[in-house]
Regions:
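Long, contiguous binding/interaction regions
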Residues: 1-202, 206
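Catalytic-core regions of core metabolic enzymes
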Residues: 183-910
Length: 910
């Protein structure tokens, strides 16, 4: 946006970032007041670094250079600085800049503080600078580098772009296009994954913890929270395998803390703590939390868990306190869990290879150690989830409550669990999803190797708890369903189902297919389980009734079924004796048969639920295997069906990134940047020639139309376009409505066109639209009329939608949705997902249409939407798909300024 030709300060370029070592920094555009800090940065640099940057020794920057470096226009001359510390203690630790050379390219330069080398600052700044340059219509970066500057050369080479190099007179010129490549996307995702996983590892595996307790005059609730977490920290694990605990308590320690077992180091103030700590836990009033974080910064904690409430969940004042807390923490290199967090539990192998237990939570009774990782957000839900897992004896490796989710979220936790050797299955209870686009990307990566079970608060996922920072969304709730389906997670409807599915995935192998054998001790129970299996989309390969009072017969039948892998993929066992209790030999027989066969098995046995010793046996390798027990046959079958769907997704072809010919992304960005250059706030609708030019950049040809006022102009237009033609009203609610008289088709000669013009004007008089002009367009071949849309949603990012035009879309909302970027498989599935889809494949004698051509148009819209966040709304309507080819007959494109939540650069919440 410009004001009187001057580009406004790009606030949306500011961001907190996670670095390679898990620490944080702040990135923002440079401003004139940075001159002194930039000079200090320069003076601190070594002679070698200065020579690499300026190709000459330069002890101080001349005043003219300082002005030129800090006074930029944020369009043709852009500079970003990475900042450590806050307020008076701010330090510039890296600088990146570009200067436009011509309409397409700019020269870039980077300089990283000597004492911050190796933290990935150059890579992060390159990502952010590239996004800014693309926003300004640039397509290529060049840089002049000394050949011996290996670190800077590596930044360019390792970014994943197609880099060209030229050595001339001792200077290496490096250049590359800015359009993201498949490789550059992979590199960014890998770097993001490693940085965020490392930041979480530093937080979840502390060797030392500092708990700061509220003062005597503060809320008693905060003191009770502190008492609980200290007691749990010092009481978890054995000496040498639990963290060292420091407590800052300005009041007299209460009895709970004084009586806690284990060694404690007590101090009256933060300033008395003598040495660095890994983790900070706050139980202080919201109003003082940011100050406490600033005072603790010298101790260099990697993260802070905020147990206290009183932040964003209580309103605008609390939100301001939360943002102040976040700024202070990130400035000191800390990640934030909370506020209003229940804390976290870690039961697993630490970085040093030893098993450790850290209970930095409010939970007194923990589930036993195991292979399930759990995340929820608010504290009340944490209580129920942990207690349910404990009662079922489902072992937990990590439990994390993100509270208000001001910083650390489910995305960060999934990054950590992807490589966590202690975790096999992940369960998420999400009251909100702050960055759905990133969630989809991270979850898909995790789900490729570990099952992810997801429960959202409200089936729509649009329920927003107090304190959760979530952007508004315009998309229908089906978009969230599609996002979860794309990402490969297992969607469940209740906490009960989450643990039902998790206990199966932790303890049983994935089913190889949908064929299920049912074994029960009565025919009615067998029928009940079989009906539940069929309703859940499973194939009942057979059902058997075996007397429950004959454990040997049960084991023999199960062994025979489970070893017949050509006929059965899973087994459901139901045993409910009508007289007396369950014979202990029956579950032992079930366990032995399941362990020996390796076939996925679930059981509903009276008196057993969860993970029980009665249903545990050793497999051929001596590894204990447990058959999960369920309260009802339907529960067992639903859990099994979820595992079957996940197994099918994991083994299916999930597609490849779209690679399309004839795409001019740089040209499209220049067109959009030029059109947006002098645009104010609000939505800008492109004229048809502009829309056609933008679509042409992506290989989409918009059929031309001519606006006419009368019959003579209509005939002249038809002569230019070619006969036969269609005549359309330009009224928005009539332009696609043949049934309302807004469209006349197959007009083959001047006489029919003149008659249609007169008749339509008379007819439209009843709608009050008689004075509107008409559109004339050449007729396409007969085919199915479709609608393709894209929209830049504030929360979901680029959402692409598809449907068959008419009442299926207008009245029934029959559209499929996908979150860009799509794969080729995503595109195929979107077209086949709509209920009216059979019309495309030869319905009731109609010839099948050219679905491949339709897929190509949808794929091109997906790439456009992913590339151009400024495209606020796009609609292709109709897209007529015939037996050969697809014709785009109408298009509307709207542009608007935007700040995409997941824009191809690493950012943290702020």
């Amino acid at each position: 946006m410009t004001v009187d030709g001057v580009v406004a300060y790009p606030q949306h370029w500011e961001a907190d970032v996670v670095l390679r070592d898990g620490g944080t920094a702040h990135v923002r555009p440079i401003v004139p007041s940075d001159a002194a800090a930039l000079q200090q940065f320069h003076v601190r640099q070594s002679e070698r670094s200065t020579y690499f940057r300026f190709f000459a020794p330069l002890e101080r920057l001349p005043e003219s250079d300082l002005r030129r470096f800090t006074q930029v226009d944020h369009r043709d001359r852009v500079a970003l600085v990475a900042i450590a510390g806050e307020a008076d203690a701010e330090r510039i630790i890296a600088v990146a800049r570009y200067d436009r050379v011509d309409t397409r390219s700019a020269e870039v330069a980077f300089n990283v503080a000597d004492d911050h080398h190796g933290r990935g600052l150059g890579s992060v700044l390159l990502e952010h600078l590239a996004v800014a340059a693309r926003e300004r219509g640039l397509a290529r970066f060049t840089a002049e580098v000394l050949p011996q500057n290996a670190q800077m050369i590596a930044v360019f080479r390792e970014a994943g772009y197609a880099v060209s190099q030229r050595l001339d007179d001792g200077i290496l010129t490096v250049s590359f296009d800015l359009d993201p490549t498949e490789r550059s996307r992979e590199v960014m995702a890998d770097r993001e994954h490693r940085a965020e996983a490392r930041s979480m590892r530093g937080l979840l595996d502390p060797a030392s913890v500092l708990v700061v307790v509220a003062g005597e005059d503060d809320s008693d609730r905060e003191r009770r929270l502190a008492s609980a977490v200290v007691r749990h920290l010092v009481g978890s694990g054995s000496p040498g395998r639990r963290p060292v605990v420091h407590v800052v308590d300005p009041a007299v320690p209460d009895d709970d803390i004084a009586d806690a077992t284990g060694d404690l180091h007590r101090y009256a103030t933060v300033e008395e703590v003598p040495s660095a700590v890994d983790l900070l836990v706050l139980a202080v009033p919201a109003a003082t939390s940011a100050d406490v974080v600033r005072r603790c910064a010298r101790l260099r904690p990697r993260g802070v868990v905020v147990l206290s409430g009183g932040f964003a969940e209580v309103g605008p004042h609390g939100l301001a306190l939360q943002r102040d807390l976040l700024r202070s923490a990130h400035a000191a290199g800390m990640r934030v869990v909370g506020p209003a967090s229940f804390g976290f539990v870690r039961q697993g192998t630490g970085e040093d290879g030893s098993f450790r237990t850290v209970n930095a939570s409010l939970a007194q009774d923990l589930p036993e150690p195991g292979r399930l990782a759990l995340l929820c957000q608010s504290a009340p839900l944490a209580v129920g989830l942990l207690e349910s897992a404990r009662r079922r004896r489902i072992g937990v490796s990590t439990f994390l409550s993100s509270g208000n989710r001001a910083d650390v979220s489910g995305n960060d936790a999934m990054q950590f669990w992807t490589d966590d050797p202690a975790t096999d299955v992940v369960g998420l209870y999400l009251e909100s999803i702050g960055n759905p686009r990133k969630f989809s990307r991270v979850a898909r990566r995790l789900a490729a190797t570990k099952p992810v079970v997801v429960l959202t608060a409200g089936r729509s996922g649009h329920v927003l708890p107090a304190g959760h920072a979530v952007r508004l969304t315009r998309v229908p709730r089906q978009a969230l369903e599609e996002l979860l389906r794309q990402s490969g997670v297992i969607r469940v409807d209740s906490q009960h189902q989450l643990l039902d599915v998790a206990q199966l995935l932790v303890h049983q192998p994935l089913p190889a297919g949908r064929r299920v054998a049912v074994v029960a001790d009565s025919e009615p129970l067998a029928a009940l389980a079989a009906e539940a299996a069929a309703s859940a989309g499973l194939t009942v390969s057979g059902r058997w009734t075996v007397p429950g009072d004959d454990p040997a017969a049960v084991e023999a039948q199960l062994t025979a079924l489970a070893t017949d892998h050509d006929a059965h993929d899973a087994v459901v066992v139901v045993h409910v004796p009508t007289v007396g209790a369950t014979d202990p030999a029956v579950p032992r027989a079930v366990a032995r048969a399941a362990a020996a066969s390796g076939t996925a098995t679930v059981a509903c046995i009276l008196g057993l639920r969860g993970i029980t010793p009665e249903l545990t046996a050793q497999d051929a390798d001596g590894v204990p295997r447990t058959v999960p027990a369920y309260a009802a046959p339907e529960d067992a079958v639903l859990a099994l069906a979820a595992a079957v769907r996940y197994s099918a997704w994991r083994s299916a072809d999930r597609g490849r990134p779209l690679r399309l010919e004839g795409v001019d992304t740089a040209g499209a960005r220049r067109l959009v940047a030029e059109r947006m250059r002098d645009a104010g706030p609000g939505v800008l609708t492109l004229e048809q020639p502009e829309a056609a030019a933008l679509l042409r950049c992506y290989g989409i040809e918009l059929w031309p139309t001519v606006v006419v006022r009368d019959a003579d102009e209509a005939v002249a237009a038809a002569d230019r376009l070619g006969w036969p033609v269609a005549l359309k009203s330009t009224a928005g609610h009539l332009r696609h409505r043949i049934d309302l008289g807004g469209v006349r088709l197959d007009l083959t000669d001047p006489a029919s066109l003149v008659a249609a013009t007169d008749q339509m004007r008379t007819h439209l008089r009843g709608f009050g639209e008689a004075d509107r002009p008409f559109e004339v367009q050449r007729m396409s071949a007969p085919g199915a009329a479709c609608v393709i849309r894209s929209g830049e949603d504030p929360r979901f990012g680029p959402v692409v939608s598809f449907g068959l035009a008419g009442d299926a879309v207008d009245l029934l909302g029959d559209m499929s949705h996908g979150i860009a970027p799509l794969t080729d498989v995503d595109v195929r599935e979107m077209i086949r997902a709509v209920r009216a889809g059979p019309r495309l494949f030869g319905y009731r004698g109609l010839p099948p249409v050219d679905v491949a051509a339709l897929e190509d148009v949808l794929a091109r819209v997906s790439v456009l939407a992913d590339d151009l966040p400024e495209v606020h709304q796009l609609e292709l309507h109709p897209v007529v798909v015939g037996e050969r080819g697809a014709a785009v007959l109408g298009a509307q494109v709207q542009l608007a300024g935007t700040d995409r939540v997941d824009s191809g650069r690493r950012v943290l919440p702020t």
